[in-house]
Regions:
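Cys-nucleophile CN-hydrolase/nitrilase-fold catalytic domain and related Cys-dependent amidase chemistry
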Residues: 15-18, 27-110, 119, 180-200
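Short, glycine-anchored, charge-dense loop/turn motifs used at functional sites
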Residues: 7, 100-108, 226-234
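CN hydrolase (nitrilase-like) catalytic-core segments centered on the catalytic cysteine
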Residues: 62-82, 148, 154-243
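Short beta-strand scaffold segments in enzyme catalytic cores
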Residues: 83-84, 97-100, 140-142, 223-225, ...
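A short C-terminal boundary segment appended to hydrolase-like catalytic domains
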Residues: 250-274
């Protein structure tokens, strides 16, 4: 039998006051752990408003404030902490980066967002993330006491090859910290979470920030967890809150027995993910 565990998505509303944001994050992670969560997921840019004018000011260098805090929160609460993402300064470059810490506070993974959000949607959102960040270069999978997992960040979800590559490397849970917006969120957010879960017969966790007003970029919220059949297992609205979901990894094997799509891959014809 494979493990069962409870996960929590901390759908936090980011503030311009960093101390206030950190205090909220610490409190919400502690609350999640007290309620039985063993894996806690923060959203994209949890420590920083999603705006070019804040990225450099809130950036973390190696052993920076955000990284130290996440390590401490993981160890103090005995949880695996998927640290959403923070602006990471490395040399003269800035990355949109997710750090993952085990229950002892040790860093076990780092994912730098591969696909940068450069869009200009007619009548909707305009953003050019590449004006601020450099793209990551690595597919990220990591082992936990529950099993192997993968992580991607927001716009990465639109590229199914990435999730497939993680699944082929053994990931049974894919975690996606994100901040979809008011243009793409209602159209594509739940659809994308369910599609990536169904495509790869994995649990897919879409961890959004809460909606906040007064910024140029307004977040959609609606954190969502989909099961290996592509059905919504847990979801919430746009407000600041903690979303809980019980995960049974035996469901992955069950679905793959019933619909053995990986056994029917025609890699003699196509091979888009290694």
């Amino acid at each position: 039998m494979k493990p069962k565990f409870k996960l929590a998505v901390v759908q936090i509303r980011t503030e311009t006051d960093k101390e206030k944001t950190f205090a909220k994050a610490e409190k919400m992670i502690s609350e999640a752990a007290e309620n039985g969560a063993e894996l806690v997921v923060l959203p994209e840019m949890w420590n920083c408003p999603y705006s070019k004018k804040y990225f450099h000011a809130f950036a973390d260098s190696e052993n920076g404030e955000s990284r130290e805090a996440m390590s401490r929160w993981a160890s103090e609460n005995g949880v695996i902490l998927v640290g959403g993402s923070v602006p990471e300064k490395c040399g003269d470059k800035l990355y949109n980066t997710c750090f993952v810490f085990d229950e002892n506070g040790e860093q076990i993974a780092r994912h730098r967002k591969i696909h940068l959000f450069d869009v200009d949607i007619e009548g909707g959102v305009r953003f050019k993330e590449s004006n601020s960040f450099a793209p990551g270069e690595d597919i990220t999978v990591f082992d936990t006491k529950f099993g192997r997992m993968g992580v991607e960040i927001c716009f990465d979800i639109r590229f199914p090859e990435l999730a497939r590559a993680m699944a082929k490397r053994g990931a049974e849970v894919i975690l996606c910290p994100a901040q979809f917006n008011m243009t793409t969120g209602p159209r594509h957010w739940e659809l994308s979470v369910r599609a990536r879960a169904m495509d790869n017969e994995v649990f897919f966790v879409g961890a959004s920030a809460a909606r906040y007003e007064g910024f140029d970029y307004e977040c959609w919220g609606h954190s969502t967890v989909a099961d290996p059949f592509g059905m919504v297992k847990a979801s919430c609205d746009e407000k600041e809150q903690i979303l809980y979901c019980d995960i049974d990894l035996n469901e992955v094997d069950s679905v793959r027995r019933q619909l053995p799509t990986f056994l029917h891959l025609r890699e003699d014809i196509y091979n888009v993910a290694k």
